[in-house]
Amino acid sequence: MNISIFDLSIYIKFFIGLCALVNPIGMIPIFTTMTNNQSFLERKKTNIVANFSVSLILLISLFFGSNILNIFGISINSFRIAGGILIISIAFSMISGQFIKTIKTKKETKEENKIDNISVVPLAMPLIAGPGAISSTIVWSTYYSSWANLFLCSLVIFLFSFVCWLCFEAAPYVVQILGNTGINIITRIMGLLLMSLGIEFISTGIGAIFPGLLH
């Protein structure tokens, strides 16, 4: 499916979807905890490497994700349904307040790793560019597959990574201003947006597999 490259609404929707999936503000306490023992310069390096890795992972998903599905014989509509279910499960954990606890558990399993290793694993993947963000990116790439659309979606990915970088750079100040309560509220709002996106993915996939079912 191709659209006019001047239709900004689809790129805004893609950007909001990524932000809702990853919730950069909700990730701030995790980033602060994981880099607590790093110096100022080390923390900056971790932030840069992590978000560069996020861009690379999502770009690979954008341009080659559908080809990978074809290799394994997975239809895009089945993948849309599976991705939608995954996104809804993440949304449930965000709304119920379990999302941060889940991430902390993953972080705790990596505590014994060297500081230099946390930029890519587990920070870039799976905490930022996790299964939800990757599957969402692949789905968008199949919706709008012209080179012009993919190029603009690439710019959205770079913008998203830049926003994550900004959030992590401002982490100490954001924690002071919002506190845990403010961050939890934002996480729940993102969860509601995310659930809507997941339902849309599922309904589109079901509608394509079973034409007329949703009409």
UniProtKB/Swiss-Prot annotation:
This is UPF0056 membrane protein BU267. The chain crosses the membrane at residues 14-34, 56-76, 81-101, 120-140, 150-170, 189-209. It is found in: Cell membrane. One of its GO terms (cellular component) is plasma membrane. Keywords: Cell membrane, Membrane, Transmembrane, Transmembrane helix. InterPro entries: Multi_antbiot-R_MarC. Belongs to the UPF0056 (MarC) family. It is a multi-pass membrane protein. It holds the Pfam family MarC.
